[in-house]
Amino acid sequence: MTRLEKIYREKVVPVMQKEFSYSSSMQLPGIEKISLNIGLGAASQNNKLMEEAVAELSAIAGQKAVVTRAKKSIAAFKLREGMPIGARVTLRRDRMWDFLDKLMNFALPRVRDFRGIPDRGFDGRGNFTLGIKEHTIFPELEVDRVENPKGMNITIVTTAATDKEGKFLLDQLGMPFRK
């Protein structure tokens, strides 16, 4: 059991049970998965950029990233169906908890002028998405070796029914939301 999962089970669960007065422990919201995505439009012309993105995303996540390909051809973007346009990885169980711990305690505080995450990223069903402008904030990547800093999307999928429950869950786990 990871450090953050232990905090969830021992501290967050009783607080949420009291706050929302659930009748069953199965109603308690939890984190289902974390999805990481890097979109690279320029990678359709530059294959080296795509390989670099996959390697870096794999290092950040701790498991192999998958290349995402274009579903449709779009002439204005010089894009053909099947061309590589990004990379993604889905984390579950222990890797998910480890990544969330690393994100909240190491990566986000390394962002320049960090004052917390805005809570606008909730989707109405308790899931939270945030964008990062530079992926070099993660400790696995050496800033000197990264040629092209890339942005990425991080989606935290919860079993919470509402945004209020989802925000409370992430807040109790230590997500640094803006006050």
From Swiss-Prot:
GO cellular component: a single term: ribonucleoprotein complex
Query: What range does the record give for the signal peptide?
Result: none
Q: Which InterPro entries match?
A: Ribosomal_uL5 (IPR002132), Ribosomal_uL5_bac-type (IPR020930), Ribosomal_uL5_C (IPR031309), Ribosomal_uL5_CS (IPR020929), Ribosomal_uL5_dom_sf (IPR022803), Ribosomal_uL5_N (IPR031310)
Q: Name one GO biological process term.
A: translation
Molecular function (GO) terms listed? rRNA binding; structural constituent of ribosome; tRNA binding
Keyword terms, alphabetized: Ribonucleoprotein, Ribosomal protein, RNA-binding, rRNA-binding, tRNA-binding
- PROSITE patterns found in the cross-reference section: RIBOSOMAL_L5
Q: How does it assemble?
A: Part of the 50S ribosomal subunit; part of the 5S rRNA/L5/L18/L25 subcomplex. Contacts the 5S rRNA and the P site tRNA. Forms a bridge to the 30S subunit in the 70S ribosome.
Family assignment?
Answer: Belongs to the universal ribosomal protein uL5 family.
Protein function: This is one of the proteins that bind and probably mediate the attachment of the 5S RNA into the large ribosomal subunit, where it forms part of the central protuberance. In the 70S ribosome it contacts protein S13 of the 30S subunit (bridge B1b), connecting the 2 subunits; this bridge is implicated in subunit movement. Contacts the P site tRNA; the 5S rRNA and some of its associated proteins might help stabilize positioning of ribosome-bound tRNAs.
Known PANTHER family for this protein? 60S RIBOSOMAL PROTEIN L11-RELATED
Q: What is this protein called?
A: Large ribosomal subunit protein uL5
Q: What is the lineage of its organism?
A: Bacteria, Pseudomonadati, Thermodesulfobacteriota, Desulfovibrionia, Desulfovibrionales
